């Protein structure tokens, strides 16, 4: 998770910035609102991603490597590259706290600054905030549907790369999940990891009940059992009930 995401932007942001400079408009004050329109499945969203958005803004820096790469494109003059070398966002950021319920056309973030500076932020902020807000909102809807029962986040293996897995887990917890199976995310964001066991655990034993009992013996106070390895209703659920009754008899 690179702290310097300066070039995490669409090329047209840079060509527009250069255009502002060449037309004497670079210092013109601009205001950008980050918002969403009417959703298809929900009338609200859960704001998320602000912490990473602020980290991104604070760490913007066009170093030698970035400048040399942009110079190699043959698109930009030295006056533009020189200004990028000294780039530091000096504008204002207003935003809703993470976890806030947000409605269509209500800004999650408002960026005010010179159009030269503010333009650069567009693509990265949309990437950061849109993804985490999407996950937090979906998590909130699932949690509401669960009606008070705890919901865990197990999305690591289906996430779109490691960063998405970590920040997706974070967003899910902000959206109301009680925990995540992602150990790295748990460490980074100071939560306790949660989880069951894999089908491979069950299949490593002679039978499902023996596997459940072995797991329960190891983790009696934190025992979650996966019941769909063979037959959920005919074996998984009855065997799990048997093991949990045995734990109860032992005082757990």
Regions found by a protein language model. Name each.
Residues 1-219, 246-249:
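Ordered alpha/beta subdomains of enzyme catalytic regions
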């Amino acid at each position: 998770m690179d702290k310097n995401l300066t070039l995490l932007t669409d090329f047209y942001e840079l060509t527009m910035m250069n255009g502002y400079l060449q037309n004497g408009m670079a210092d013109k004050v601009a205001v950008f609102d980050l918002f969403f329109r009417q959703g298809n499945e929900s009338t609200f969203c859960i704001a998320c991603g602000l912490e990473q958005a602020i980290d991104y803004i604070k760490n913007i820096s066009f170093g030698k490597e970035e400048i040399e790469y942009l110079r190699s494109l043959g698109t930009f003059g030295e006056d533009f590259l020189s200004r990028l070398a000294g780039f530091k966002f000096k504008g204002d950021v207003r935003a809703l706290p993470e976890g806030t319920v947000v409605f269509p056309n209500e800004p999650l973030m408002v960026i005010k600054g010179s159009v030269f500076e503010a333009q650069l932020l567009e693509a990265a902020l949309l990437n950061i905030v849109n993804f985490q807000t999407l996950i937090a909102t979906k998590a909130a809807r699932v949690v509401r549907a669960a009606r008070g029962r705890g919901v865990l986040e197990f999305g690591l293996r289906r996430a779109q790369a490691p960063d998405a897995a970590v920040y997706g887990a974070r967003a899910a917890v902000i959206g109301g999940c009680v925990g995540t199976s992602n150990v790295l995310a748990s460490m980074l964001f100071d939560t306790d990891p949660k989880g069951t066991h894999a089908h491979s655990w069950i299949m490593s034993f002679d039978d499902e009940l023996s596997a459940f009992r072995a797991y329960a013996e190891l983790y009696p106070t934190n025992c979650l059992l996966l019941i769909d390895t063979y037959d959920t209703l005919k074996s998984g659920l009855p065997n799990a009930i048997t093991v949990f009754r045995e734990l109860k008899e032992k005082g757990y």
